Regions:
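Short acidic/polar active-site loop segments enriched in Thr and Asp
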Residues: 133
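Positively charged n-region of N-terminal signal peptides that target proteins for export
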Residues: 2-3, 44, 64-68
């Protein structure tokens, strides 16, 4: 018994070992697409786990743990390679701008329900300067909803602008006519936009965060419902909203593959949308604008948060 305790003390509680073993366990489980809510959380933090592994490497060097530091570097390399290669639908960027024919500029902004309506004037100025064709708002209070209505002169078309909205509902504003609008009970908005003689289906959605078992299961049901919508929608499709998934997540990569939707992710020009109070390079992107394969991304950026815990995501597409 004493020998076993001594072995545990040497291997587990030796300086740096707890952090080292925790890092290995997190790396392993975060790359599995398990239907377990507390493990799923780690899958969305791939970039942060990698940064933690690099910091751990220097800690192990400081503690003179040579072999542990070597293993740590090796795991970091394998982990980074898996992150970079896991999403085959995250590379839809237009490299040759001479191919641009038609453009569509979109903004998705989770305003945050508790955001003061006093911040709307700055939000309005941002929208005017970015000149989008389509704007989607999410998580807005009744007071902020009243402010959004003042944009009617700029965006004359909308998805039921005058109807009351819940905290997880979406509201789409457009400069171009919207037809066949449908708002359902799954926090999903579906509408059609015709631009340059091309009909485009736009789906706005707010997926629940998987922080609890109940919310995680509800989010999986929403994803299953979205797959059905995408399957029954025309080939020109844009899906946007707070998806509560990051590009490093296996669940996100699987969703893109099964719906045949695309996006563009750059780890050089990071666009973290949440949480806005953290530096961009430490945050995560949970707000997305996804599209079918006949679109390509021209530009993607974020701006100031204007009192929200999310940053607005701005994307320009070519089609």
């Amino acid at each position: 018994m004493k020998g076993n305790l001594a072995f545990i003390d040497r291997t587990v509680f030796k300086k740096g070992n707890i952090l080292f073993f925790f890092f290995l366990i997190v790396c392993f489980f975060s790359r599995l697409n398990l239907q377990i809510f507390f493990i799923d959380i780690f899958s969305h933090l791939g970039f942060q786990i990698l940064i933690g592994g690099i910091l751990l490497f220097f800690i192990l060097l400081f503690l003179k743990r040579f072999w542990a530091s070597v293993i740590c570097v090796f795991v970091c390399i394998v982990f980074a390679a898996d992150i970079l290669s896991s999403c085959n639908h995250c590379n839809a960027v237009l490299k040759d701008r001479s191919q641009i024919q038609n453009k569509l500029r979109l903004i998705n902004f989770n305003i945050s329900y508790n955001n003061s309506a006093k911040n709307f004037e700055n939000i309005r100025e941002m929208i005017l300067s970015e000149k989008p064709d389509v704007v989607q708002f999410q998580e807005f209070s009744p007071q902020m909803h009243d402010k959004i209505k003042t944009l009617r002169s700029i965006f004359p078309y909308s998805t039921e602008l005058n109807k009351p909205k819940g905290p997880f509902d979406s509201l789409i504003l457009s400069k171009h006519p919207l037809t066949n609008t449908k708002v359902d009970d799954n926090h999903v908005v579906i509408t059609n936009l015709t631009l340059n003689e091309v009909e485009i289906s736009i789906v706005g959605v707010h997926l629940l965060a998987g922080g609890t078992k109940k919310n995680f299961n509800n989010a999986l049901q929403q994803i299953s419902y979205l797959k059905t919508i995408v399957k029954n929608t025309n080939k020109n499709l844009i899906l946007l909203g707070d998806l509560n998934m990051t590009p490093t997540s296996k669940r996100f990569a699987k969703f893109l593959k099964e719906t045949n939707l695309y996006t563009y992710t750059s780890y050089k020009n990071i666009t973290s949308t949440w949480p806005a109070f953290m530096p961009n390079f430490l945050g995560i992107q949970i707000d997305h604008i996804l599209f079918s394969n006949n679109f390509k991304m021209i530009d993607k950026k974020i701006t100031n948060s204007f009192g929200s815990v999310h940053r607005p995501l701005i994307v320009e597409l070519s089609y």
